[in-house]
From Swiss-Prot:
It comes from the Eukaryota. Residues 398-531 form the Fibronectin type-III domain. It comes from Homo sapiens (Human). A zinc finger (RING-type) spans 30-80. The gene is MID2. This is Probable E3 ubiquitin-protein ligase MID2.
């Protein structure tokens, strides 16, 4: 049920009364002891001070054992006014009787009851301490053992009492009615912190100069009197806020460290797993090598045995043949020696003729009778040389990812739609292939944080974990180029160079080369390369009849005698503007060209939509933007509005930078590396380079790379003056 209106009004009035009483109590508090004034003195400066507190001030100013009688002055603790004392000392000061009466009435109004303003304030003051103290607090006045539990703590007495002792020691009469009673608190929290220099004083302010807790006497008469001090509450709030902020940062840092430690532990576990896998793989590979060696050993041993058997068989046959020949020769020799012993000539002649023929025949045919024997075939030409294999075995090691290649920017070349990238690597023998990755340079957005990819620099397709683009990789078209977001990938390159075709003209690209082998891959540092601008020539079909175009289509000259050209809707036809246009329409990329004006003093150079009027000077409509000169005046013009441009003297060449993608058209003085002006244009149609002259000639240099002093797409200061051209009203004379 809701409260009655009377109780609501009563509660509201009670709260208002409590607020007023709290405010009054702060006015009745001594600045030294921070308690209600007791026997207050009225100082000449109109402030008040407890008699005992004033006495402590005088005592603190004396040396040890010295009397306070010689002291004739002290400072007011509130306003620092010097209070002079007569021969009576403190007794010579007036008592503030009115203040004492107010304090007595205030104490009567705040006696007993938790809703009294003083009680509420005291409870709030000690509530945090009470909340923190959940232990049992015993009565400090009980004589029995063990003492009873305390029900109240007297702040004035600095003692905790049980209910019986509280009634006995604090009757409802003066001076006990002014004692502050709170819920029981530990004695350590009750007494608070005392001053280091004044042992009987509690700290109640903070010295900022010394970064130290002090009491009021330290500020009045102590060594902190000239120091900057602050209230405990202000210092408490400031330090608490700082500590909370630092604690928040520390907790955040700890959380980050915990995450990093978890990742490190995960990596350690992965190292253990990978190490075990590599060790098992090592044993497997070495066992296979040992098996291969054993097999080759057995095979070579068999071959040696077979060769031995074959050679011994052949030699045994040769020995048998030699033995047979030897036996035959021995028989013939014996027969011949026997005939030679015959002394009878007739018998000798009869027998020797046959023997002599046989010996002569045996001697003549000795080469035929003795078999062909190879004495060098002793199995000496066979050798076992495993030195090459030993070196290979000695070089056995685990394969690591190749060193990152390096793009040779000085060797790279470009046209308006191609870039040839060259790179080198000091680890070519361990590289199985290269992979070329490239994308249009858009600034720091090309470099993705680790939250996208575990390798920090996108793309590392093979080892990417959390990149959102990985879901698109599965559906990417197969072929030479695989697109992941805006990156293009050219895989399986075997050479140290590659030419990329089909690029945008005048555009910067980021290139990364990845060296790959079975152990992994490593990227080169990203390199920025840019294509040249789109080359163009002057289109004869759009050229004014009174202009002459050179054979190479790069120079235009005023020629009054050239009137043979037929009129077409595309041709410039104004009577005061002799215009020409390039033979291209640009709808993307960044393009740069230069125009050599020579001695021409009347011209306009810029761009225009195809729909721009052909019978007036370019820049006088909303479809064209130009840089123009009329004699000594240089202006930029669009939609018939002009601004003067400060141009260096003798401007002979003008640089034009069209950044279609960033909606900018800029003009430069390339000879002095000076930026002249930039148009901010929201292009909605393709644009065409456009030129108009009134005298002399112009020459176009197209397909150029942007000079190094132009760091597009950053904006540069221009030399325009935002005021009307002095000859705007007389524009007809220029046209």
């Amino acid at each position: 049920m809701g409260e009655s209106p009377a109780s609501v009004v009563l509660n509201a009035s009670g709260g208002l009364f409590s607020l007023k009483m709290e405010t009054l109590e702060s006015e009745l508090t001594c600045p030294i002891c921070l308690e209600l004034f007791e026997d207050p003195l009225l100082l000449p400066c109109a402030h008040s001070l407890c008699f005992s507190c004033a006495h402590r001030i005088l005592v603190s100013s004396c040396s040890s054992g010295e009397s306070i009688e010689p002291i004739t002055a002290f400072q007011c603790p509130t306003c620092r006014y010097v209070i002079s004392l007569n021969h009576r000392g403190l007794d010579g000061l007036k008592r503030n009787v009115t203040l004492q009466n107010i304090i007595d009435r205030f104490q009567k109004a705040s006696v007993s009851g938790p809703n009294s303003p003083s009680e509420s304030r005291r409870e709030r003051t000690y509530r945090p301490t009470t909340a923190m103290s959940s232990e049992r607090i015993a009565c400090q006045f009980c004589e029995q053992d063990p003492p009873r539990d305390a029900v109240k703590t007297c702040i004035t007495c600095e003692v905790s009492y049980c209910d019986r002792c509280l009634r006995a020691t604090h009757p409802n009469k003066k001076p006990f009615t002014s004692h502050r009673l709170v819920e029981p608190v530990p004695d350590t929290h009750l007494r608070g912190i005392t001053c280091l220099d004044h042992e009987n004083e509690k700290v109640n302010m903070y010295c900022v100069s010394d970064d130290q807790l002090i009491c009021a006497l330290c500020k009045l008469v102590g060594r902190h009197r000239d120091h900057q001090v602050a209230s405990l509450n202000d210092r408490f709030e400031k330090l608490k806020q700082t500590l909370e902020m630092n604690l928040t940062n520390l907790v955040k840092r700890n959380s980050e460290l915990e995450n990093q430690m978890a990742k490190l532990i995960q990596i350690c576990q992965q190292v253990e797993v990978n190490t075990a896998m590599h060790e098992a793989k090592l044993m497997e590979e070495c066992d296979e090598l040992v098996e291969i060696i054993q097999q080759r050993k057995q095979m070579i041993a068999v071959k040696i045995k077979e060769t031995k058997v074959m050679k011994l068989r052949k030699l045994a046959q040769q020995v048998a043949n030699c033995r047979q020949c030897l036996e035959r020769s021995t028989v013939l020799i014996n027969q011949a020696e026997h005939i030679l012993k015959e002394n009878d000539q007739a018998r000798f002649l009869q027998s020797a003729k046959n023997i002599a023929e046989r010996v002569a025949m045996a001697t003549a045919s000795s080469q035929v009778l003795i078999p062909d024997i190879n004495f060098n075939d002793a199995f000496e030409n066979f050798a076992l040389d495993f030195s090459r294999e030993k070196k290979l075995l000695e070089g056995l090691d685990y394969l690591t990812a190749p060193n990152p290649p390096s793009i040779r920017e000085e060797l790279c070349t470009a046209s308006h739609d191609t870039i040839t990238v060259h790179w080198i690597s000091d680890d070519e023998f361990s590289i199985s292939s290269y992979e070329l990755q490239y994308t249009i340079f858009t600034g720091q957005a090309n470099f993705i944080s680790k939250s996208w990819c575990s390798w920090g620099l996108w793309p590392e397709i093979r080892k990417c974990k959390e990149a959102v683009s990985c879901s698109r990789l599965a559906g990417a078209p197969r072929g030479l180029y695989n697109s992941v977001d805006s990156w293009m990938i050219v895989p399986n390159i075997k050479q140290n160079h590659y030419t990329v075709h089909g690029l945008q003209s005048g555009t910067r690209y980021i290139f990364i080369v990845k060296a790959i082998n079975q152990a992994g891959s490593r990227n080169s540092e990203p390199t920025r390369l840019k294509t040249n601008s789109q080359p163009f020539k002057l289109d004869p079909k759009m050229t004014h009849k009174k202009l002459k175009i050179s054979n190479d289509g790069l120079q235009m000259e005023k020629d009054e005698s050239s009137l043979k050209k037929s009129h077409t809707p595309e041709r410039f036809s104004g009577t005061g503007c002799y215009g020409a246009a390039g033979n291209i329409f640009i709808d993307s990329g960044c393009h740069y060209w230069e125009v050599v004006m020579g001695s021409s003093t009347w011209y306009a150079i810029g761009i225009a939509y195809k729909s721009a009027p052909k019978n007036e000077w370019i820049g006088k409509n909303a479809s064209s933007w130009v840089f123009s000169r009329c004699n000594s005046n240089f202006v930029v013009r669009h939609n018939n509005k002009e601004m003067l441009v400060d141009v260096p003297p003798h401007l002979k060449r003008l640089g034009v930078l069209l950044d279609y993608d960033n909606n900018m058209l800029s003009f430069y003085d390339p000879a002095n590396s000076l930026h002249l002006h930039t148009f901010d244009v929201t292009f909605i149609l393709p644009v065409c380079p456009t030129f108009t002259i009134w005298n002399k000639s112009l020459m176009i240099l197209s397909g150029l790379p942007a000079p190094d002093f132009i760091d597009y797409p950053e904006r540069q200061e221009c030399n325009c003056r935002p005021q009307e051209s002095p000859y705007v009203s007389g524009m007809k004379t220029c046209h």
